[in-house]
Regions:
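Signal-transducing coiled-coil/dimerization helices and immediately adjacent hinge/linker segments
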Residues: 83-90, 260-338
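Regulatory sensory and allosteric helical modules in signal-transduction proteins
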Residues: 140-201
Length: 338
């Protein structure tokens, strides 16, 4: 075999054997087609993925493959990448300690904000240590009227790394339903992974500007309170070990919610909603509506807490948006939600 000029050329030679391609894909935790996209430079692997590739490739190629990768990735180091990989595989002990301390020592009305902030920060540090571009959102079930079903989710927390940090912080007030990956994960009751949007078979779950997306329901005793959404601007970004990590974080996010915020599966019947752009006008008056409700409640001598007024406004807006006819594009399915 002539000496390969790049790690992509060498990998192309290795995976020319279909069985070896499948073996490598299984060992790395990616789709076999992902390896082909690496070879053709259609997709950029993470350092952690390259480390796994070097470790599991045929022994006769490992040294050359490592050297070729280092030529293209100047900051690539097997030692550093191994550290990144190990750090990304499990929730750190100190995160568990911090969350339990919040639950034990702080007022209940601060639990959601403090716990969600701690967990989102820890997730970003683990899932995107090199600031590639990852966004995280927590979308809670919108509280339904008595005896009614949950029809939508709404964003209650999140953050991101550039360039998704600004987008995540801006997209605070809007509703999603069954048309979103987050809503679909809640409906089916399990983690969903879309690792390459361009070739995916579920166009109605695509997200504008996003190449990889994960959504995991936040559950307790079989009931659901929210969906944890994690997205990246890179295709094939999330390894199998990181899907397990995201599930672990979703279990911890459940500690941020109160008992009454969880709903039995039969009470969750998500509907399709207009896209975020069409919702902006409605939500531009969100805070104004909250203040009006609180003022009326005070005049009626039945004052409301801010959270109670916000719940009522979410319900009002949900009802209004469910009555809005979907556009042709929305009915056919391309959405822009996390």
């Amino acid at each position: 075999m002539a000496e390969a000029s790049s790690w992509r050329n060498l990998l192309g030679t290795i995976i020319s054997d279909p069985q070896e391609r499948q073996r490598l894909a299984n060992a790395i935790g990616v789709n076999p087609f992902t390896l082909t996209r690496w070879v053709t430079n259609q997709s950029l692997p993470r350092r952690e993925s390259l480390l796994r590739l070097v470790k599991v490739c045929p022994p006769q190629y490992s040294a050359l493959l490592s050297n070729l990768i280092a030529q293209e990735w100047e900051d690539f180091s097997l030692t550093d990448a191994a550290g990144d990989l190990q750090a990304a595989e499990a929730v750190p002990t100190e995160v568990y300690t911090d969350v339990l301390a919040i639950k034990a020592t702080t007022p209940q009305n601060t639990h959601f904000w403090m716990i969600s902030q701690r967990l989102v920060s820890a997730m970003l540090k683990q899932l995107d240590p090199h600031n590639v571009g990852v966004g995280i959102s927590i979308l809670a079930c919108t509280k339904p009227a008595a005896g009614k079903s949950v029809r939508s989710l709404h964003v209650v927390g999140g953050d991101g790394t550039a360039p998704l940090k600004q987008k995540t912080s801006e997209a605070v007030a809007y509703l999603v339903g069954i048309e979103s990956l987050a809503g679909y994960a809640v409906t089916v009751g399990r983690l969903l992974s879309l690792q390459h949007m361009e070739g995916d078979r579920l166009p109605f779950l695509k997200i504008a500007g996003i190449e990889s997306a994960i959504a995991c329901p936040v559950k307790r005793e079989g009931r659901t309170a929210a969906s944890l959404s994690v997205v990246s601007i890179q295709a094939d970004y999330f390894l199998q070990t990181q899907l397990t990590l995201i599930e672990s974080y979703a279990n911890l996010v459940a500690l941020a919610f109160t008992e009454e915020q969880f709903y039995e599966p039969e009470r969750i019947r998500l509907s399709a909603l207009p896209d975020q752009q069409r919702q902006r006008l409605s939500f531009s008056t969100f805070q104004q509506r909250v203040k009006q409700l609180m003022n009326v409640a005070v005049r009626n001598q039945h004052p409301l807490k801010v959270t109670e007024a916000e719940e009522q406004v979410w319900q009002q807006l949900e009802g209004e948006l469910l009555d809005v006819p979907l556009s042709t594009e929305e009915e056919s399915g391309t959405k822009v939600y996390p």
